[in-house]
Amino acid sequence: MSKKDKRKQLIDAAYKVFVEKGYLNASIKDIANEASITPGLVHYYFKNKEELLHSVQEEVQNRYQKQYDGHTGESISPPEVLHEIKTRVEKDPDWYRWRYEIYSLGIKDKGGHLENQVDSILNNGRESLANPLQQMVKNSLDAKALASILLACFDGLALQKIVNDQFDIDHSYKLLTELVELYIKISDSD
């Protein structure tokens, strides 16, 4: 296995362990066990657990951004985007669990690197939503505000679904889609 492949294996193992145990409860030994390697080898690739955390976040962010690279507001509709985000909760709830773990760590790291990471995650999320919305809403300030609202809705609805399997996320997203489409229609007529 190449050095790059081994590094990726460790990042994938760390992602799984951090999601299951939380960053603070996870150890290098846990990550090494998940990756089926010795703990000493983890330190060959990563200086410490925090460096591994940052590498996991970078990998998660890159994977997410690749989904939307090249999409403009005209190439993907709001219902398609909302459907993809809703189904992510069902298909990959660990993606959101990871997100909440990073949020929790960042909130406690006032002025530190993790707080900046959370700010970057949220900013990237807003931008990835605002850019295509600007094609539909016309007013860039409104597109950015709508992106912030949608991001809060996505995270909040996902949290409700993860902690309560009976939560009707389908109905909530149906209504959210109708609200977004109505807002776009109204803003288009201005």
Language-model-detected regions and their locations in the chain:
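Short, charged helix-capping/linker segments at alpha-helix termini
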Residues: L24-N25, V137-K144
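Helix-turn-helix
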Residues: Q9, A13-E51, S55
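Helix-loop "lid/cap" segments that line or gate small-molecule binding pockets
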Residues: H83-E90, R99-D109, L179, Y183
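Hydrophobic alpha-helical connector segments
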Residues: S55, K66-D94, A143-L150, Y173
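Amphipathic alpha-helical packing segments from all-alpha helical-bundle domains
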Residues: D69-G70, K91-R97, K110-V137, S148, ...
